[in-house]
Amino acid sequence: SAAHSSAVRKALEEKGLISREHGVNRCIQINGMEKNTDVPVLGRVAAGYPILAVENIECYVPVPDSLKRGRELFALRVQGESMINAGIFPDDILIVHRTPVAENGEIVVALVGDEATVKRFYKENGHFRLQPENDNFEPIIVDEVALLGKVISLVRYFD
């Protein structure tokens, strides 16, 4: 009923959850909504065997400004199953902080030659180990690796 919806609206206003522009009907603003920045999805990254790295903007995903915090971010769509034990599944969209450095154990997007892959990063005994999170895949051991960035979040859509 109109009386009930008016009472609910008034209660939400009193709690500071919404505000209304007085004198304008049907104008309700939700308070505390964080602003977003659109981050480009630059293509696919292998969670499996490395795939050729090609940057091509597919679309954009909204990322809260509190996650961005002035950092340069990009996104990649996951292809493959090597990171499923870390909760990263095919078609997930990884939000990546572009940086050339990472700590041991962090999940990174790495360039091995001209192929990109997402793995857990370890620097050890004069080489680098890119460790999958799926027992069906072997680690990638290399003497040289270029880090494209650290995975800081992911977006998953349910269809």
Model-identified regions with their sequence ranges:
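Short, positionally conserved secondary-structure boundary motifs
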Residues: 3-89, 116, 123, 127, ...
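C-terminal regulatory/effector modules of DNA-binding transcriptional regulators
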Residues: 88-159
